UniProtKB/Swiss-Prot annotation:
Homopentamer. The lineage of its organism: Bacteria, Pseudomonadati, Spirochaetota, Spirochaetia, Spirochaetales. It comes from the Bacteria. Keywords: Bacterial flagellum, Coiled coil, Periplasm. Its main location: periplasm. Residues 324-337 have a biased composition (Basic and acidic residues). The keyword Transmembrane helix does not apply. InterPro entries: FliD, FliD_C, FliD_N. Residues 660-710 form a coiled coil. Residues 264-277, 344-358 have a biased composition (Polar residues). Required for the morphogenesis and for the elongation of the flagellar filament by facilitating polymerization of the flagellin monomers at the tip of growing filament. Forms a capping structure, which prevents flagellin subunits (transported through the central channel of the flagellum) from leaking out without polymerization at the distal end. This is Flagellar hook-associated protein 2.
Length: 722
């Protein structure tokens, strides 16, 4: 009995036997699980093909839909530092000239230095920006707390900041964030008291400087020094009445009205112009009427040129009188004008020489004068800043207005008479300040509110903002700085947008073709040819390689894609048929020797140079090649992009071919997974049964072993007694 043994049964040996038996039982289950993985790979492959097909459909549909790139426009600026242009697809193709003279800006006023412990008293502080009012109820406190309170209330309209003007000095800067003349910054209530206290503003004075007359003879020039430098930021305007007169009359008036330094003009005939002194002590001469006694009247028309407004005087039908001419002496034989007493030390100085004898003869013979004069402003550095030349005729005075802010800081006016037959005379010269809001002007303006001013196709235009959307339909013009000369802006078709859209179409097409090639073939070289794949994408594509090998649906789709991209289509009004190869797109766009296996797989190539030239020369034909209306019903019904869209539509969507195929695979996956679950339950039950049987067998063997041992012990004891 002790020799009775069952192979594989004993101390744990039955486990190996059970596993061996269960391994054979698991074969059907493992086969079903392997099918699930195959189905999952196939389903992922179908979904990838569907995704790339949808990307291609979206790309080609965009080539003929209402937002197709062939209607896109791009705007060009010849000086992007000075101005930039943005155009929408609604803008028309056009070209314009532009010269920026002023940039719209807002007021920015700087205060005098204030101490570190400066406190702002309590009160209602009202800041006005145009018609907008910003009220701050202040209980009093340190100026930095006041800054925070103003900025919180001002938001995007008013900014108050602290400026360190030096290491130990600080000042307040009041800045308006709104631009344009209509958005001037002013102060009311307690804000006005604070502005006056800190010398942010002061009471305005209308005329900064006045002068009766300045006259220069033929071939000579004169200089008029201002009592103090005129700052560009002060918003000043120089005005005068210019006229061309006979040489003898002008020479006498030049002598009579030349002012002495620091005083009023003197006259050899006792005609002294009255003078008033401003607060700075500089002489301010009140304008007088012209020599013939006729007052300067409002102009009937004007011309604006390079920042200067030239205004015509009112027309007069009467012949000029000779009253008062007898007081002017005749020109001497040498043509030299007698110098008025004190002229060499006066504010207005005359230089140069020229003969006027012939000129007087010309005047007597023709009875009329016509000519031009050169004007210039002198900068603080001594540079001459030319003004547009004056073109005048005799007895036709013109009023001229020059905004000084366009010329920077200046200190003098220079007059050069290039006319050889008459004298150039400026009367009623004055420098005035612009209308000040509330009767106050800034003391230290960092900038002053002004409109943007520019010449657009020769027409003077102003706007209160630098972003102009209402000048050209569909175009936004953004001004950045002044231009030194006339620049150009243009709106043209956006060829790059068209080309990029076509390149995107080709890329999406090739990606779909590559995916079909990968899943329907088991050649790893297909993946190796795709250099644009990332390592992760290559790993994924390797898993899907050949997963749908020989799939007739995908092979048919591939064939139809190739045929649609190689077919000819009628494109354009000329009725000519064109293919993608005509614009540089084909399976062999670049000439090469030998056979390229990649070209045999149906991938498209692009000759960018040919495509670019086609878009430039035949944009409408290229557009029609991708999609056009062939029957006049205003609906696109032909073209490469249209036919590809129609081809792909049945494959996509919830009820499309890919969705149906994918749903079928999902059902197989579910049914197979259920079979796997059933196998797992059966195998678990089978393993329990085997373990129960072998445990029972093992118990029986152990019982028999014990009985055998008992018998042996009994026999041994019997033998021992004998």
């Amino acid at each position: 009995m002790s020799d009775v043994r069952i192979p594989g049964v004993g101390a744990g040996k039955y486990d190996n036997l059970i596993q061996s038996l269960m391994k054979k039982e698991r074969i059907p289950r493992d086969n079903a699980a392997a099918k699930v993985k195959v189905y999952e790979v196939q389903n992922n492959a179908l979904k990838d093909v569907e995704r790339y097909a949808r990307d291609l459909r979206d790309a080609v549909k965009g080539l003929y839909s209402f937002n197709n790139p062939f209607a896109e426009k791009e705007a060009h600026s010849s000086n992007e530092r000075a101005f930039t242009v943005d155009a929408t697809r609604d803008a028309a193709e056009q070209n314009h000239t532009l010269r920026v003279k002023d940039i719209a800006q807002g007021d920015a006023f700087l205060s005098d230095p204030l101490p570190e412990d400066f406190r702002v008293p309590s009160g209602t502080y009202t800041f006005c920006i145009g018609e907008k009012k910003i009220c701050v109820s202040w209980k009093g406190g340190h100026y930095r707390d006041f800054i925070r309170a103003v900025n919180k209330q001002g938001k995007d309209s008013l900014t108050l900041s602290e400026i360190k003007t030096s290491g130990a000095s600080r000042a307040l800067l009041f800045r308006s964030e709104l631009t344009g003349k209509s958005s001037r910054l002013s102060f009311e209530d307690a804000a006005l008291d604070l502005a006056l206290r800190l010398r942010v503003v002061q009471e305005a004075r209308s005329d900064v400087f006045t002068q009766d007359v300045l006259s220069v003879g033929p071939g000579k020039h004169a200089r008029l020094d201002f009592p103090h430098p005129l700052r560009a930021q002060a918003g000043l305007t120089l005005e005068f009445v210019a006229s061309l007169e006979g040489a003898s009359i002008a020479n006498e008036e030049s002598r009579a009205h030349t002012p002495a330094q620091g005083g009023a003009p003197t006259s050899s005939h006792g005609n002294t112009a009255s003078a008033a002194h401003n607060q700075d002590g500089a002489a301010a001469v009140r304008p007088t009427e012209p020599a013939n006694g006729a007052p300067v009247q409002e102009e009937t028309s004007s011309v604006f040129f390079e920042g200067v407004t030239v205004k015509n005087e009112a027309s007069q039908g009467d012949l000029p009188t000779t009253d008062g001419l007898e007081k002017y002496p005749a020109v001497d034989d040498k043509g030299d004008n007698p110098r008025a007493p004190g002229e060499s030390q006066g504010t207005a100085t005359h230089e140069g020489s020229g003969s006027s004898t012939d000129n007087a003869d010309d005047t007597r013979s023709t009875g009329a004068l016509a000519g031009s004069g050169k004007l210039a402003l002198e900068s603080l550095q001594g540079h001459a800043l030319p003004l547009p030349p004056l073109v005048l005729t005799q007895n036709a005075p013109q009023m001229v207005s020059i905004p000084l802010r366009e010329y920077g800081d200046v200190r003098a006016l220079i007059l050069d008479n290039a006319q050889a037959r008459g004298a150039l005379t400026l009367r009623a010269i004055r420098v005035r300040a612009e209308d000040a809001p509330g009767g106050y002007v800034p003391v230290n303006p960092a900038s002053q509110a002004q409109d943007a001013a520019f010449d657009f196709d020769g027409v003077h235009v102003t706007r209160g903002t630098n972003s102009i959307t209402d000048l050209i339909p569909g175009v936004t013009l953004s001004l950045h700085e002044r231009t030194e000369k006339t620049e150009t802006l243009s709106v043209t078709p956006d060829v790059n947008a068209m080309k990029n859209a076509i390149i995107e179409f080709v890329a999406k097409y090739n990606r779909l073709m590559a995916e079909i090639n990968i899943v329907t073939s088991n050649k790893s070289a297909i993946i190796d040819e795709l250099a644009y794949l990332t390592p992760e994408e290559k790993k994924k594509e390797t898993e899907q390689l050949g997963s749908l090998h020989g799939d007739s649906t995908l092979l048919m789709l591939k064939d139809r894609l190739r045929r649609n991209t190689s077919n000819a289509y009628r494109a354009g009004d000329d009725g000519a048929s064109r293919t993608l190869a005509h614009i540089g797109i084909s399976t062999k766009a670049h000439a090469s020797s030998g056979i390229n296996t990649a070209q045999l797989r149906g991938y498209l190539e692009i000759d960018e140079e040919k495509l670019h030239s086609s878009l430039n020369a035949q944009k409408d034909q290229v557009r029609a090649l991708f999609g056009h209306d062939s029957d006049g019903d205003l609906l696109v019904d032909n073209g490469v992009a249209f036919t590809l869209t129609e081809l792909l539509n049945p494959y996509l969507g919830r009820s499309g071919i890919f969705a149906i195929r994918s749903n079928g695979v999902d059902e197989r996956i579910k049914s197979t997974e259920k079979r796997v679950e059933t196998y797992d339950k059966q195998l678990e039950k089978k393993e329990r049964e085997l373990r129960h049987k072998y445990h029972t067998m093992d118990g029986a063997l152990r019982s028999l072993q014990k009985q055998s041992d008992a018998i042996q012990n009994f026999n041994q004891s019997v033998r021992n007694r004998n």
